[in-house]
Amino acid sequence: MLSPAGKISLQSFTGSSLVFFVICMFNHYYGITNLVVNTLIVFFYAVNVYFFLKFFYNEFAFAIAIRAAFLGLVLVLGLYIKLVAPPNIQIFGGYMSVMALFHYSEFLAIAIVQPKQVSTDSFVINHSPQYTIAAVSSWVEFFIETYFFPGLKEIHWLSNIGLCVCILGEVLRKTAILTAGSNFNHLVQCEKSSDHVLVTHGVYAWFRHPSYVGWFYWSIGTQIILINPLCIPAYTLASWMFFKERIYIEESMLLSFFGQQYCDYQQQVGTGIPFIEGYKI
């Protein structure tokens, strides 16, 4: 059963997506290609959505609804850019849609498995300064290279490989969340709850940390989509270092929770990320 917050997010995400899709189709049909006009259309649509949701929802529900609606807008806008933009800009549209789907599906997955803990943080849109800096850096690289080397951003077969990597990573991560159910949490837990059990079946029989494996490859895939030769290795290294530390801390907690049971699990199943061993006793 989807929580009330999950239902609000789903209504806002799908509603915003569908309405903006209709607007984009009208826009395409009438051949409106002026950048200023299109920017104003997006701006006025966003403003109208803001006040519409503000009128109907209380503070907490509005905070969820506006984020979900924004992600729905970004999803469709990305698809529209992918369809009508110049060849060297089209891949950025695909990237926008991938980002929107990832962040919305993060919230929806938590709303399903942890309905009592869901919050605006569950969108993981701005969960750390490092994440924001990394995202902005990739945008800066993309547009600088688009300006000076437009042909680089027209290698669509390579960008499509990145899209496939993102899809596989996304599916793996969300499968891991749904498999773990109430045992999954965005934050490393320092105390074992009474209903916390060690999950070792499904994708957890493949990797000890399938949600991290999915996110690791998804993050690299986003930069392959953008064909960012600088950010691809930078994201790979930064993500690897982040998950190395995260897994080390998390496994120290899991060993204290489950003892020999987790130790045996470590012996049987790897972390899933190359050269990361985790916490060993």
UniProtKB/Swiss-Prot annotation:
It catalyses: [protein]-C-terminal S-[(2E,6E)-farnesyl]-L-cysteine + S-adenosyl-L-methionine = [protein]-C-terminal S-[(2E,6E)-farnesyl]-L-cysteine methyl ester + S-adenosyl-L-homocysteine. GO terms for molecular function: protein C-terminal S-isoprenylcysteine carboxyl O-methyltransferase activity. Gene3D superfamilies: 1.20.120.1630. Its EC number is 2.1.1.100. GO terms for biological process: methylation. Residues 1-2, 54-58, 114-118, 182-208, 244-281 are cytoplasmic. Keywords: Endoplasmic reticulum, Membrane, Methyltransferase, S-adenosyl-L-methionine, Transferase, Transmembrane, Transmembrane helix. InterPro entries: ICMT_MeTrfase (IPR007269), PPMT_MeTrfase (IPR025770). Coiled coil: none annotated. It holds the Pfam family ICMT. Residues 30-35, 86-88, 150-155, 227-229 are lumenal. It is an enzyme of class 2 (transferase). It is found in: Endoplasmic reticulum membrane. The chain crosses the membrane at residues 3-29, 36-53, 59-85, 89-113, 119-149, 156-181, 209-226, 230-243. It is a multi-pass membrane protein. GO terms for cellular component: endoplasmic reticulum; endoplasmic reticulum membrane. Substrate binds at residue 246. S-adenosyl-L-methionine binds at residues 189, 196-199, 204, 209-212, 250. Belongs to the class VI-like SAM-binding methyltransferase superfamily. Isoprenylcysteine carboxyl methyltransferase family. Catalyzes the post-translational methylation of isoprenylated C-terminal cysteine residues. This is Protein-S-isoprenylcysteine O-methyltransferase.
